[in-house]
């Protein structure tokens, strides 16, 4: 069994409320990712993105990681981990600094981003992301990459995402209890956007709605940058609960019924179609109309989509989402979900599946793997950025040494 250090491997760990997914990918010479191992396990001990039984979460994570390692024939030591929950918050901030040498360098960019992130933050909050939106040099606005440009002062606008420190610590503790370290904690919807969006969609304006089991995570892009993020603590598990209660069937059976037979729009289902529903307490199974099932599910999807639509309107970005909506996550796959969403949002809607991966791509060609694959894409960018910074640092040291020699001799 090879170790991650012997190969250029990245691991994504999506600790969801319903399912835990672990994916390992190998960084190839052409800067693409080849997926070499996938592991999934039913999530236990999680509720709406938070840990409510640490030991159960540890067991579930260990099972998913072991399955992934077995498939990939490798041993991993660290992961890029997702996080969600209503405790995740966002804000847009700005910072300003003078340009040191009249020409913008990477140090100037780092300084202005640091100025933007230097906002008062409660002790119980953890900074997850500082995502630059655009730069202003003197009077020139809308600059995407300011390096090399001339000016006196520079301003940066940035989107800041934070979470509850304790929530993040509990998830990290679960991962570390499995003998792994966490490279970085990433907001779930941000990771999903890396997996399912195109550059054109980001530029035109797009909203990603990641509908999982416990939470519905959202991120809005306009002009190539993130402008708004939010989490709604309601998602697919509520639909399963509705089915279980109304049809008086166990939760496990309700989940199976949802996956196999459910439809988000009752008008798309024939009145003649029937399904068999197991009963509780040893009672005989019953035959129910699939149309009746859709009548139960449709109001819940309407609630979910209307809550998401309220978030879009509250952001003030509704008119800027020209590319429409991308729904992803396990709950986005249901028949009728796209059609129903188009009715409510009055904009184009598609289901987002991971793209731009090689290797075992067929294993993850599914909306429920959006976050896990996105963690690999995010991790790749993170690694490339570190390598670029390290290379620039080495070049800077070399230049200083050369200057010293010139001065001495």
What are the roles of these predicted feature ranges?
Residues 1-19, 23-208, 225-227, 236, ...:
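Nucleotide/phosphate-binding catalytic cleft detector across ATP-hydrolyzing
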Residues 14, 210, 303, 310, ...:
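Extended, folded domain segments that form the structural surfaces/walls around functional sites
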Residues 58-65, 301, 305, 309:
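Short, hydrophobic/amphipathic alpha-helical packing segments
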Residues 81-86, 323-333:
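Glycine-rich beta-strand-to-loop/alpha-helix junction loops that act as flexible
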Residues 213-215:
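Short acidic, Gly/Ser-rich segments with clustered Asp/Glu that frequently serve as metal-coordination loops
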Residues 218-219:
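A structural feature that tracks compact, well-ordered secondary-structure segments
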Residues 222:
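A cytosolic small-molecule/anion-sensing beta-strand core signal
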Residues 308, 327, 375:
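Hydrophobic, well-ordered secondary-structure elements that form the walls
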């Amino acid at each position: 069994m090879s170790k991650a250090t012997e190969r250029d491997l990245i691991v994504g760990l999506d600790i969801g409320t319903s399912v835990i997914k672990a994916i390992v990918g190998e960084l190839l010479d052409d800067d693409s990712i080849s997926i070499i191992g996938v592991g999934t396990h039913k999530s236990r001990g999680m509720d709406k993105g938070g840990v409510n039984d640490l030991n159960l979460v540890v067991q579930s994570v260990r099972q998913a990681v072991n399955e992934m390692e077995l498939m990939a024939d490798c041993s991993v030591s660290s992961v890029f981990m997702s996080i969600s929950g209503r405790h995740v918050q966002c804000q847009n901030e700005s910072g300003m600094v003078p340009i040191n040498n009249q020409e913008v360098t990477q140090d100037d960019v780092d300084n202005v981003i640091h100025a933007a992130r230097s906002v008062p933050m409660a002790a119980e909050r953890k900074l997850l992301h500082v995502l630059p939106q655009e730069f202003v040099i003197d009077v020139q606005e809308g600059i995407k990459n300011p390096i090399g440009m001339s000016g006196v002062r520079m301003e940066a606008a940035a989107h800041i995402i934070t979470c509850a420190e304790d929530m993040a610590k509990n998830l990290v503790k679960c991962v570390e209890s499995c003998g792994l370290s966490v490279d970085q904690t990433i907001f779930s919807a941000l990771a999903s956007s890396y997996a399912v969006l195109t550059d054109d969609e980001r530029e035109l304006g797009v909203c990603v709605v990641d509908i999982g089991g416990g939470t519905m995570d959202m991120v809005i892009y306009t002009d190539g940058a993130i402008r708004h993020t939010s989490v709604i603590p309601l998602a697919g598990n509520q639909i399963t609960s509705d089915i279980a209660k109304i049809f008086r069937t166990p939760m496990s059976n309700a989940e199976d019924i949802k996956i196999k037979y459910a439809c988000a729009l009752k008008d798309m289902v024939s009145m003649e179609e029937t399904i068999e529903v197991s009963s509780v307490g040893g009672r005989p199974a019953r035959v129910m109309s699939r149309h009746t099932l859709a009548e139960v599910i449709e109001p819940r999807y309407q609630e979910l989509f209307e809550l998401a639509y309220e978030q879009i309107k509250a952001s003030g970005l509704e008119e800027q989402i020209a590319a429409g909506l991308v729904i992803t996550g396990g709950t986005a796959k249901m028949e009728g979900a796209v059609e129903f969403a188009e009715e409510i949002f009055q904009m184009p809607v598609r289901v987002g599946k991971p793209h731009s991966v090689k290797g075992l791509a067929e294993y993850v060609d599914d909306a429920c793997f959006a976050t896990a694959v996105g963690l690999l894409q995010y991790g790749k960018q993170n690694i490339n950025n570190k390598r670029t910074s390290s290379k620039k640092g080495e070049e800077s040291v070399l230049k200083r040494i050369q200057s010293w020699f010139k001065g001495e001799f």
